[in-house]
Amino acid sequence: VTASIAQNQNKDTSNSAPDAAIEVKNLSKIYQGQHGQPEKLALNDVSLSIPHGSFFALLGPNGAGKSTFINILAGLVIKSSGDAKIWGYDIEDQMRAARRSIGIVPQELNLDPFFTPRELMEVQAGLYGIAKNQRRTDEILDAVGLADKANSYARTLSGGMRRRLLVAKAMVHSPRILVLDEPTAGVDIELRIQLWDYVRELNRQGTTVLLTTHYLEEAEELCDKVAIINHGRVVACDETKTLLSKMDAKELNVTVAQTLNNVPDLLRGHGYNVNLIGENRLSFQYSPSKVEIGNILDLVSQAGLTVADLTTKESDLEDLFLHLTREDNAKIA
């Protein structure tokens, strides 16, 4: 079902896809202050190019400007300056074509409680001018796991079901780009997996996906490219693997057979940090470009310790996110 939806969605665009599904240049947004409050610079000269067919994550702390960025694409907020294009269409000069090219799943669970999912889907399709014989309401509801709730009132749906219904509504007009703003907030693990299976299949069939999430492990697993935004500015943008490789930080945990009261002196002063955890676990934080793991293990042996177990931990997207945002905050301060 998902494959047929995605194929229908992209069948007329494969020969005319632009290099960038979303492209913004020098985009800024200033909210005017009210009641004597100072103005707020929500986006500060943001430039981003999101390749068509990519699975792209836009990450940032609360108040970083992510929602403002998405709301500008959706036409809910007017930009102060800069340019933005969706599928090659300018969001102001070619507004209708731009809107037809994008489906947005909002963060807020805003649904009419007195309509059923089927009715909400039909209304949404009507707003986009989709002929009744071209609508795929039941297909999409089945794909997001709501076929058995199609005729239930929206007010009776759980939070996770409402979230999936928002995804379904965003897909009624077969958009080339799907924007997901915190889509798995309040969704249990099983339904989260089902939702991501659906979105992954859409992406495999050519749909460009833009994701914002606070579940950084999701972004790391799903997305091939990541942009991190802080205080309205892009502080990093690259392929996920490339960004992680720049962290140059690993952790080695060595459990030894002996009981320790402190870190042996022989293990100190070699260009890494080492801490004793409990009575027999040594935790080493080191830079792979400067220190080799074999050298650490040699020193452990020279200290007369017997290795009972060891584990390593690579830097993940959460480490990168915290590192870059803290570094940026320090520059601003």
Task: Label the predicted regions.
Residues 153-157:
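Conserved ABC ATPase signature
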Residues 74:
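Helix-to-loop junction immediately C-terminal to a conserved catalytic motif
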Residues 174:
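Conserved catalytic motifs of ABC-family nucleotide-binding domains
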Residues 178-181:
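Catalytic Walker B motif of ABC-type/P-loop ATPase nucleotide-binding domains
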Residues 196-287:
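ABC transporter nucleotide-binding domain
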Residues 122, 126-149:
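Conserved ABC ATPase "signature" region
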